[in-house]
């Protein structure tokens, strides 16, 4: 017991309980679970220690009882559940004592009942610990999300990345880029092409009008920028060169007025963060290599470059650095490569390395602010998803699948919620959650997918059938349902046929259930043996009859009708083979067919024609 009391989890638990003079079951479980302690193993000993400390352990049921009892004592005379007056102080004490006696047993049973491998129970327990939000808190979180998104958007619109990225968007919308979407040339799947086409339509609708007027100037600016890059000019020249700076400011002022969509904000911000990671990696690599060569500045770098070119200085470098010339050359080359990559990044972002890192840090702060507020709003409303999902059980999907689909709808609701309209978030989110759940039932509940509009028609027929069953006391006919819905009888029958559920091939058949339904279903992939035999006999008979014809007529018929498994050749193709005209081949074919129509030959094939 002494060793147990010295463990961090139990020490924290006792400290917390001594301050409050009481503790609840949930608090005991949460504190132990926070320190990674198996609750069920230590629960007996922990409860004994709490009893020795004269600390009361209350269950959640007891807290509810206490609230109810004292509400009855303080309020007006009310029914006590059996028509009596409010509880007296003695009855209150008796009930609380009875509850205390059961507290220990309740806690032990709860710990055993929640299995560690039951994800549904664990999930429901976790989301139950989240506190609900007030309308003011929802507005505050929405404002924080808006603020985080605003930080990211401001950084992107003020950065030099905006102009090159919009130039690439404009180029992707040009006619040359459209040719790449040809499946024959691209070698991509239909899905990939359709997704790219959808994204292209979105970009064209959002930015097409602006880019149509700015693209020629953007192309001219990018050409000037490329010339400066090829000359080896530093990135600061973009702000110092008068012509480039004038063109750049003009284009940026136009692009900053464009309303960026969420897809572009997300893509640009991810590019900033990914590039910042690359920059930090390049700088670490460069610092490591410079330490190996004892380079402090650019002057030392040039000295090593000159030293490697002169044999006498090369030997001195080897002696100073303690490595071979080849190794020095390799490290020197690596430094040059990293320097070129960093310079390339500066030109792509039209900013210095320090400026890019500073912007990336600001974007990261905006992302953290946005994510924290978004997660808080989502977690506080997970119980709403569960309550809505309960209404859609037994419709083809498991309860937990419905909850997860509803969670997807909740995430979309958080992203699209407009707090300025004055509605409470739960009112708005309910519609998104319902839509996500009903759509998932329509798409996934059936083995064979049925379109959503057909699902709606099936629901109408089912609803009317149920109402007519209650009205007539019997199953309604198709005509009665059609009359009620103002449909045709054929449409009702069609909807009913679509509504039929698939049946398993393993369904047992017969009284003894010694066979399954699959045993009686013909295999469409296997050809009927009698038909195969019949075709072989027909082939042999035709070959025998054709052998009685002259060789030329036999060959013409074989080529014209593709009797050897080849395709049927045209008169012109057969004529080229025999080096005669099309008309001559037609005459030979007609003569051969006339011979075959003789009863002596046709009688042999008549049986095959009847079958």
UniProtKB/Swiss-Prot annotation:
UniProt superkingdom: Bacteria
Principal location listed in the UniProt entry: cytoplasm
Pfam families for this protein: Sigma70_r1_1, Sigma70_r1_2, Sigma70_r2, Sigma70_r3, Sigma70_r4
Signal peptide: none
Region described as Sigma-70 factor domain-3: 456-532
InterPro entries: RNA_pol_sigma-70_dom (IPR014284), RNA_pol_sigma70 (IPR000943), RNA_pol_sigma70_r1_2 (IPR009042), RNA_pol_sigma70_r2 (IPR007627), RNA_pol_sigma70_r3 (IPR007624), RNA_pol_sigma70_r4 (IPR007630), RNA_pol_sigma_70_r1_1 (IPR007127), RNA_pol_sigma_70_r1_1_sf (IPR042189)
Record feature DNA-binding region, as residue ranges: 571-590
GO BP terms in the entry: DNA-templated transcription initiation
A cellular component annotation (GO) from this entry: cytoplasm
Keyword annotations from UniProtKB, A to Z: Cytoplasm, DNA-binding, Sigma factor, Transcription, Transcription regulation
Gene3D superfamilies: RNA Polymerase Primary Sigma Factor, Sigma-70 factor, region 1.1, Winged helix-like DNA-binding domain superfamily/Winged helix DNA-binding domain
Region of interest called Sigma-70 factor domain-4, as start-end residue ranges on this chain: 545-598
Location of region: Sigma-70 factor domain-2: 377-447
CDD domains (UniProt xref): Sigma70_r4
Gene Ontology molecular function, alphabetical: DNA binding; sigma factor activity
Residue ranges annotated as motif Interaction with polymerase core subunit RpoC: 401-404
Entry's localization field: Cytoplasm
Function: Sigma factors are initiation factors that promote the attachment of RNA polymerase to specific initiation sites and are then released. This sigma factor is the primary sigma factor during exponential growth.
Subunit structure: Interacts transiently with the RNA polymerase catalytic core.
NCBIfam families reported for this sequence: PRK05658.1, RpoD_Cterm, sigma70-ECF
Family: Belongs to the sigma-70 factor family. RpoD/SigA subfamily.
Designated name of the protein: RNA polymerase sigma factor RpoD
Organism ancestry: Bacteria, Pseudomonadati, Spirochaetota, Spirochaetia, Spirochaetales
Underlying gene: rpoD
């Amino acid at each position: 017991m002494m060793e147990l009391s010295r463990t961090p989890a139990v020490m924290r638990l006792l400290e917390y309980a001594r301050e409050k003079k009481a503790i609840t079951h949930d608090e005991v479980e949460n504190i132990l679970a926070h320190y990674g302690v198996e609750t069920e193993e230590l629960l007996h000993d922990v409860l004994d220690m709490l009893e020795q400390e004269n600390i009361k352990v209350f269950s959640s049921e007891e807290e509810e009882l206490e609230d109810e009892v004292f509400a009855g004592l303080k309020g007006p005379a009310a029914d006590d559940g059996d028509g009596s007056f409010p509880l007296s102080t003695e009855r209150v004490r008796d009930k609380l004592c009875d509850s205390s006696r059961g507290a220990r047993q309740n806690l032990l049973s709860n710990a055993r009942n929640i299995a560690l491998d039951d994800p549904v129970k664990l999930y429901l327990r976790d989301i139950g610990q989240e506190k609900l939000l007030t309308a003011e808190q929802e507005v505050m979180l929405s404002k924080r999300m808006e603020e985080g998104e605003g930080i990211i958007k401001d950084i992107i619109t003020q950065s030099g990345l905006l102009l090159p990225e919009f130039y690439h968007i404009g180029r992707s919308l040009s006619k040359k880029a459209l040719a790449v979407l040809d499946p024959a040339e691209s070698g991509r799947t239909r899905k990939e092409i359709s997704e790219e086409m959808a994204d292209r339509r979105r970009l064209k609708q959002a930015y097409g009008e602006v880019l149509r007027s700015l693209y020629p100037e953007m192309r001219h600016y990018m050409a000037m920028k490329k010339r400066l890059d090829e000359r080896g000019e530093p990135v600061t020249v973009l702000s110092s060169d008068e012509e480039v700076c004038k063109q750049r400011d003009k284009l940026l002022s136009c692009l900053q007025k464009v309303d960026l969509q969420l897809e572009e904000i997300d893509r640009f911000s991810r590019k900033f963060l990914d590039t910042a990671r690359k920059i930090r990696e390049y700088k670490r690599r460069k610092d490591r290599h410079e330490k190996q060569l004892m380079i402090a500045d650019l002057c030392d770098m040039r000295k090593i470059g000159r030293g490697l070119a002169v044999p006498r200085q090369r030997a001195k470098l080897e002696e100073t650095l303690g490595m071979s010339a080849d190794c020095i050359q390799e490290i020197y080359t690596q430094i040059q490569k990293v320097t070129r990559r960093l310079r390339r990044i500066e030109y792509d972002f039209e900013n210095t390395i320090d400026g890019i890192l500073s912007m990336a840090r600001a974007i990261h702060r905006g992302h953290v602010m946005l994510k924290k507020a978004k997660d808080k709003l989502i977690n506080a409303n997970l119980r709403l998803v569960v309550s809505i999902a309960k209404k859609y059980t037994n419709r083809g999907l498991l309860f937990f699948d419905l909850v997860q689909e509803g969670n997807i709808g909740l995430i979309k609701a958080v992203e699209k919620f407009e707090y300025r309209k004055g509605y409470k978030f739960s009112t708005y989110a309910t519609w998104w959650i319902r839509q996500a759940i009903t759509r998932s039932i329509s798409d996934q509940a059936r083995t064979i997918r049925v379109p959503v509009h057909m699902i709606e028609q099936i629901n109408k027929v089912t609803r009317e059938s149920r109402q007519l069953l209650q009205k007539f006391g019997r199953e309604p006919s198709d005509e009665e349902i059609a009359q009620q819905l103002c449909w045709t009888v054929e449409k009702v029958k069609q909807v009913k046929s679509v509504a039929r559920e698939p049946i398993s091939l393993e369904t047992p058949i017969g009284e003894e259930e010694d066979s399954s339904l699959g045993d009686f279903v013909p295999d469409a992939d296997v050809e009927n043996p009698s038909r195969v035999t019949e075709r072989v006999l027909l082939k042999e008979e035709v070959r025998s009859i054709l052998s009685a014809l002259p060789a030329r007529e036999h060959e013409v018929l074989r080529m014209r009708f593709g009797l050897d498994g080849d395709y049927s050749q045209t008169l012109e193709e057969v004529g080229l083979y025999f080096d005669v005209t099309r008309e001559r081949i037609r005459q030979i074919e007609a003569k051969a067919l006339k011979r075959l129509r003789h009863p002596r030959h046709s009688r042999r094939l008549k049986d095959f024609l009847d079958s």
